[in-house]
């Protein structure tokens, strides 16, 4: 054998010797540690109560020994409420308290944390410990879905703890409109890629949690939610305003015969969507969106959770008597608004040929003010502006001649004159302004409207317009008016004579003296320029003042028409609730019905009583004969 072979045989022998020596050392160390542990365990399981040195095999046995032998029970007349462990001397008032205190001295820890495996002596200690885990994050994950080293805590058996429903301090769950709090299972919250869905929020890595649990839901905190909350606040204000109005109407805090008070209260309700169903329809348009944060963009959830539409009841409009009372009050308010002479004349209610055309909404041929469902207007497309949707109806007839295109002037021989109450300039303030006399205009000829030549909104059967002032719905040309006399510098002499001849067809031609307006018939205020504004001096102060006056008149007319719309919508809402029975039965009606039933029962019982008297009847000899 060579020297190399001998060296190779010696090396495995040395390796085996070193391995056996190391294993012996390990066994010796293990035995020493086990002996030390047994000694410590024996010391901890030794009863240290006064005058007792009993040794128990387990902590449970030691605890039972102390409770039964040293603490005792009240039923056996040996109850001891003072701790005798070493020199503790803690005194309690109940047996449960002393037994709970004994757990401090006994190495019994039956309450184990399901996250980290740490054991505790008392359940309240475990509850406090679990809260430290819950404070980290309410969004939990499992190691299978995390895919990294941040896996969930594992028990010694290797099972992943993913359920906290048995823990008292469980803050996890999400709110579902169809049910209550759901305990989660197998959710995700970790360092996964952020999906493309814009509605899901990707948490920062510093807030990551590695605890197993259920899916967490965060409320979206993007800028669109700010606008949504603002819309909720606006709807809440509208709801409060409507409820306050019904309350004031029920308590008669509004003078229904005063147009000023009625106008002031109705202006607060303009623009409020008044629907049916117990209050403001779609008061909550949609609940706050709760979106799951699973780290994958939420591709498997199919969009946000379904929301439910509902409407809130009005506290001041609950019973049937409230509905009837408010309906009568609204009828009085409606008659007050309609009977306002200046307002009705300004809107053309008393004009025989007036018909209304609302731009892009509807077409009506009647003498009543326009009626539209306010909630329908409010539910139009978002790109339609509110001012356009709530624009008032405009009368489409005009007082101009078709042939000449000039204003039709009133013959001075007319016996009808303006009074102080119906003068075009007699009204002031925000109240609607009268532009026509309420007396009969049979002496005036009926002239076709100038808008019939080019307006597509008119039909062939539309009634002809009489002399009067209204505005054309066509934005190409707008005629202002109200004054039936010649404007300064508006027409030359030949055009004036032609217009006079056209306006007095079938009647004797007035003399030149009669055609000249008399000074006493001219209103001593600013007159309206009846010619096309494009042909006049736009920079003159008179034109600017006339435009200001016209804009004030327009605002007054719009306010009056909006008041009519609001009243009609309110009455329609109240009548719908009465017809559908959407109210709470009055207690008075129930009391009256119960009283009627009691009266009927009393009458029936009275009739059922026997006719015979309760006392004996003494008969005489005459009665026998």
From Swiss-Prot:
The keyword Transcription applies. It holds the Pfam family zf-C2H2. Activated by C-terminal proteolytic cleavage by signaling protease (probably palB/RIM13) at neutral to alkaline ambient pH. SMART domains: ZnF_C2H2. The keyword Transcription applies. InterPro entries: pacC/RIM101, Znf_C2H2_sf, Znf_C2H2_type. Residues 391-416, 461-472, 490-514 have a biased composition (Polar residues). GO terms for biological process: positive regulation of transcription by RNA polymerase II. A motif (YPX[LI] motif 1) lies at residues 444-447. Keywords: Activator, Cytoplasm, DNA-binding, Metal-binding, Nucleus, Repeat, Repressor, Transcription, Transcription regulation, Zinc, Zinc-finger. A zinc finger (C2H2-type) spans 45-70, 81-105, 111-133. Residues 1-34, 417-438 have a biased composition (Low complexity). One of its GO terms (molecular function) is zinc ion binding. Induction: By alkaline conditions. It is found in: Cytoplasm; Nucleus. Disulfide bonds: none annotated. Its main location: cytoplasm. It comes from the Eukaryota. A motif (YPX[LI] motif 2) lies at residues 615-618. GO terms for cellular component: cytoplasm; nucleus. Belongs to the pacC/RIM101 family. Transcription factor that mediates regulation of both acid- and alkaline-expressed genes in response to ambient pH. At alkaline ambient pH, activates transcription of alkaline-expressed genes (including pac1 itself) and represses transcription of acid-expressed genes. PANTHER family: PH-RESPONSE TRANSCRIPTION FACTOR PACC/RIM101, PH-RESPONSE TRANSCRIPTION FACTOR PACC_RIM101. This is pH-response transcription factor pacC/RIM101. It comes from Sclerotinia sclerotiorum (White mold).
